[in-house]
Amino acid sequence: MASGDLIVKVADKDTLDRTYANTNAILAAVGEDVRIKGVKRYGMKINKNDSNPATRCTYLFDAVGMTPAAMNYSAGRFDFGDWGNVFFVKNNYPAMVKYDGTEDYKLDPNDHTKKADGKTASDVSNTAYGGNAMSVFDGSGDKGKIWLSQFEVGNYEYMIISNVQYDESYNDDAYVREDGSHADKLYFPMFGGSYDGTRIRSLAGQALMYNTNASTEIARAKANGAGWNIGSWSKRNLLNCMLKIMSKTDNSQTAFGQGQTSGYVNDASQNYGHLATGTLTNKGQFFGYKDTTHEVKVFYIEKWWGNRWDRINGLLMVGGEILAKMTPPYNLTGKDFEKVGITFASSGNGYQKGTKSSRFGRIVNSIGGSSSTYTCDYFWWNAGITAVALVGGSCSNGEYCGADCLDLNSSAGIAGWSVGASIFLEQPIAA
């Protein structure tokens, strides 16, 4: 070989194959890194053995190091902590929505009597308006739906929210339509359900509907049109998890407000002490009071607990066994529901102590707590009937009330001054 000739060494096939495979692995890893850059997971684990509602909660994943959100009662304002720009908070807004499910216009977030321009009067209390005031969670496009994972490991319960289906344990049950398709938006009522003579409404300045049984409530909700119904356990459970993760506590009333948990009067002419809807229309996205005479507001929704019990679909007790159905269609008998693995004997009541987290949400499985320990909320049950879930408590239940307050002691036929329902909407399928 002459001096200066170029010598090229070619690797053997095994070396080339290994190099090719390694290069592909590196490129795949880079692609995966790019893919997950926009993914968020806000998680919390709850120590079953710690009765303190705050110290039992530990942040996980992207929530680690974040300042929790809570009412600043002395200053009279809600402090978002580090949660104001989190996707499920910033993509939530108040809007007027037509009976056909069309979003008509957004409302001023700090004064719902105005449209979003802050000047034009809205229809938030107009009973002649052909629709309802709704709290919208927009997961369309790249905004991200609210995916939820719940499970237990040892003495810990886990609840994790993500803007993607991070793995197969994450569900979007709250978005599932009755036909089985999946929506991109959620529509919750801004106000407790009132009655206009034909249908349940979500409007300000109205008397709450009460003294109705489950069948009547469902019929009046559906009278709004296709896609309207009363609340469901999957929607209730999802929003409760959002509140707990934001506030890093199991005591919803301490973090967000007591709600109207007193004021009952035995007088129908005074609506038994129920506050009218819309008392917090000028209080923003979240607001509450330390006293028991005012409403509480979370995610633009008044009355998430207190004032009047709300009946919901999807959670029953049949012969002492708790059954759940996380997606529609629903019924009041338990057909096609699933066992959640929790059974109570006889009938009883007490402050919640133990809870079980699973694919069916977080559900009480024992009593023995108090108003300041564990979930801080109360539970009633009756193993001798088919009971339909009531949630939140009323204006006669005091400290028993809260996000987790649950009654499985009432049949579908029960009607009384303290019980009613509110309306929710499934996003229409785009034409």
Model-derived features with residue positions:
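Short, solvent-exposed loop/turn elements at domain surfaces
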Residues: 143, 149-153, 195-200, 399-400
